[in-house]
A protein has these predicted regions:
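Class II aminoacyl-tRNA synthetase catalytic cores and aaRS-like
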Residues: 1-397
Length: 397
């Protein structure tokens, strides 16, 4: 009776079922994680392009080898349909017992979603128009012990998505696309900066003093020197030292660490790109910012008109420069300047839900109004200029 209960527990637990399959493979002398490199002939996206004109119901004698993760399985008697996913896309595997033989067919029937396999076969398109590989042999490359997120509900919990990105990447194609675009964007940044005469450098992440921004740092102890060190909160100070040393143009793409709040738009660890150029001014840096962003967009998009969150963003042409007071005035429906009485700015701030501190000056109040009601009105790329001195600690005066 106890043995029957144990078997029932295993059947009810998908992880235990998979572990039992792995143990069965090991008992048969088979390696559930492959024992040699698998040489694939194509990525799936290449097959989609090469056989785009293949007619419905047409078979070929073109042999291919592909590798990927099993994302779906459908058994219909002596035929099994798999959906295989690699880093570039998905394709159907058409598996017939006559082509595979009974033993291999039984092994394929025992595969689980999430298993990694390599498959060899001939290209074809089903009568229903599905591009497929008619499999004649396969190899288990890695047995998955954990089931994928449920097919129809997917992975929607933001907390899990952020903490387990590898799972998010498996089931959400748009996330994988974002990762790939990010890589292309960083490469475009580097190409543009290097073409413009900038040297890419690496500055220390562990620093003996905190500086370069007003943020709380992560603190660690350096045992060898018996001293407190800080994870950098900005790359600024060391980049400026390189200019002091004689470099004219430098930039760094690097990780920044700030021990502060965390939400979907703020991460304690993030990447920044910071650049410095000798003999330059605001106009020159505006030109740099516009150029590098347009270059990054060109690397991942075919147009300079982008659809984002229901709005069309136009990054073409020269980007406008608008004073902060002008943006705030437009949002308020009345003109405000740095000469506007503080008492009136306080009234406007409170009216817009801003908690005002007694020490705030006109410049600080305008900056707060900009953050609250001005910035949300900006859609296209815009250089906001003439920041108040109170919120511009590093600006020339």
């Amino acid at each position: 009776m106890a043995e029957e209960n144990n078997e029932q527990v295993i059947e009810d637990d998908p992880i235990e079922v998979r572990r039992a399959k792995r143990e069965a493979l090991l008992a048969e002398g088979k390696n559930p994680y492959g024992h040699a490199a698998f040489e694939y002939s194509h990525h799936i996206v290449d097959l989609d392009e090469k056989y785009a004109e293949l007619a419905d119901g047409e078979n070929t004698e073109d042999a291919v080898s592909i590798a990927g993760r099993v994302m779906a399985k459908r058994v219909q008697g002596k035929i099994i349909f798999f959906e295989l996913q690699d880093a570039t896309g998905r394709i159907q595997l058409f598996c017939r017992i006559n082509a595979l033989g009974e033993d291999a067919f039984a092994e394929m029937k025992d595969l689980d979603l999430g298993d990694w396999i390599g498959a060899h076969g001939l290209m074809m398109r089903t009568r229903r128009g599905q591009l497929s590989v008619a499999v004649d042999s396969f190899q288990l490359l890695s047995k998955a012990l954990r089931p994928l997120p449920e097919k129809f509900h997917g992975l929607n919990d933001k907390e899990i998505r952020y903490r387990q990105r590898y799972v998010d990447l498996i089931v959400n194609d748009e996330v994988r696309d974002t990762f790939q675009k990010r890589s292309k964007i960083l490469s475009a940044f580097r190409r543009y900066m290097e073409a413009d005469g900038y040297y890419e450098v690496e500055t220390p992440i562990l620093q003996t003093v905190q500086g370069g921004a007003t943020a709380k740092p992560f603190i660690t102890h350096f045992n060898a020197l018996n001293q407190e060190n800080y994870l950098r909160i900005a790359t600024e100070l060391h980049l400026k030292r390189l200019l002091v040393g004689g470099f004219e143009r430098v930039f760094e793409i690097g990780r920044i660490f700030r021990n502060e709040g965390m939400d979907p738009t703020h991460n304690p660890e993030f990447t920044s790109m910071e650049a410095y150029c000798a003999f330059n001014d605001l106009q020159g840096m505006k030109k740099l910012a516009q150029g590098v962003i347009k270059a990054a967009n060109a690397a991942v998009n075919d147009s300079e008109q982008l659809e984002y969150q229901g709005q069309t963003i136009d990054i073409s042409g020269e980007w406008p420069s608008i004073p902060m007071t002008e943006i705030v005035s437009k949002a308020l429906g009345e003109e405000v300047t740095l000469d506007t009485p503080v008492s009136h700015l306080v009234e406007l701030a409170k009216k817009n839900g801003i908690e005002v501190k007694p020490e705030w000056t006109a410049g600080k109040l305008i900056a707060e109004l900009y953050d609250e009601i001005g910035e949300p009105t900006i859609v296209n790329p815009t250089f906001v200029v003439d920041y108040p001195v109170e919120v511009s600690p590093l600006a020339k005066r």
